């Protein structure tokens, strides 16, 4: 079955996914290719609900490839339908990292414009983070604590699962 890399934005899903398989599936990148605009622009034009629908459709398609390494966006767990799909997948790997580390990573990543980060205060962002934690943990079949580990170390842990 597919290996799904779960975690909040900034957890390292894309970086680790590329190490595990250069042809891995980054759902955000695939959606951007499909819609022809950035996710931030899509949020403004179509709204978050429309984005979450596209995300669910993409997840359904990708889960058909049993050998895939898939990196969904951090909000994949918000949609109950996505959680149902993921609960049937035996390899959901949660890349766990604390809020302050994530916040610092995202704040320092000038190349990636993340709508939920840009449009919320730190306190509001923390509430989103706290709301998703139990969802990640409930769906995870494996939890990898990634703080103080290099992407290569994280990838090696995942290979051993």
Question: What label would you give each PLM region?
Answer:
Residues 3, 19, 65, 130-161:
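NTP-dependent small-molecule kinase module
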Residues 11:
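ATP-binding Walker
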Residues 74-76, 98-100, 149:
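Short glycine-rich anion-binding loops that position phosphate/pyrophosphate groups of nucleotides
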Residues 14:
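Walker A/P-loop
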Residues 23, 68, 91, 141-142:
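Well-ordered beta-strand positions
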Residues 27-75, 80-87, 122, 126, ...:
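ATP-dependent small-molecule kinase phosphotransfer cores
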Residues 8:
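P-loop (Walker A) phosphate-binding loop of NTP-binding proteins
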Residues 88-133:
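A glycine- and Lys/Arg-enriched "phosphate-lid" helix/loop adjacent to the NTP-binding pocket
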